[in-house]
Amino acid sequence: MSLTNEQLIEAIASKSVSEIVELIAAMEEKFGVSAAAAVAAAPAAGAAAAEEKTEFDVILAEAGANKVAVIKAVRGATGLGLKEAKDLVESAPAALKEGISKPEAEALKKELEEAGAKVEIK
């Protein structure tokens, strides 16, 4: 006897929650899959990555109105020469530092924002 999809859905809908849980467990075992991993993989992975992140990238989004002060701040933070710092600021959005600790990233962001730049930490 072969059931149509609609008949199968109706049969599942008539079951209690505990019966559905048992059905899911039996299907996971039979097919060697995990329904929980498939359903919650993307949100759980994103949350875990956000909690475990130890390295951050500081991105200069915009130089702002006071470009000279931002160039000075970039030079001080990165050790670049004047021309390289100017080119970096003018090419915004651009990565200033990558793979740094959260406190270092936040300190750099604060320093650049005080100079007038718009900064993102990723």
UniProtKB/Swiss-Prot annotation:
<dbReference type="InterPro" id="IPR008932">
    <property type="entry name" value="Ribosomal_bL12_oligo"/>
</dbReference>
<comment type="similarity">
    <text>Belongs to the bacterial ribosomal protein bL12 family.</text>
</comment>
<dbReference type="InterPro" id="IPR014719">
    <property type="entry name" value="Ribosomal_bL12_C/ClpS-like"/>
</dbReference>
<dbReference type="GO" id="GO:0003735">
    <property type="term" value="F:structural constituent of ribosome"/>
</dbReference>
<dbReference type="InterPro" id="IPR036235">
    <property type="entry name" value="Ribosomal_bL12_oligo_N_sf"/>
</dbReference>
<dbReference type="GO" id="GO:0003729">
    <property type="term" value="F:mRNA binding"/>
</dbReference>
<keyword id="KW-0687">Ribonucleoprotein</keyword>
<comment type="function">
    <text>Forms part of the ribosomal stalk which helps the ribosome interact with GTP-bound translation factors. Is thus essential for accurate translation.</text>
</comment>
<dbReference type="GO" id="GO:0006412">
    <property type="term" value="P:translation"/>
</dbReference>
<dbReference type="InterPro" id="IPR013823">
    <property type="entry name" value="Ribosomal_bL12_C"/>
</dbReference>
<dbReference type="Pfam" id="PF16320">
    <property type="entry name" value="Ribosomal_L12_N"/>
</dbReference>
<comment type="subunit">
    <text>Homodimer. Part of the ribosomal stalk of the 50S ribosomal subunit. Forms a multimeric L10(L12)X complex, where L10 forms an elongated spine to which 2 to 4 L12 dimers bind in a sequential fashion. Binds GTP-bound translation factors.</text>
</comment>
<protein>
    <recommendedName>
        <fullName>Large ribosomal subunit protein bL12</fullName>
    </recommendedName>
</protein>
<dbReference type="InterPro" id="IPR000206">
    <property type="entry name" value="Ribosomal_bL12"/>
</dbReference>
<keyword id="KW-0689">Ribosomal protein</keyword>
<dbReference type="Pfam" id="PF00542">
    <property type="entry name" value="Ribosomal_L12"/>
</dbReference>
<dbReference type="GO" id="GO:0022625">
    <property type="term" value="C:cytosolic large ribosomal subunit"/>
</dbReference>
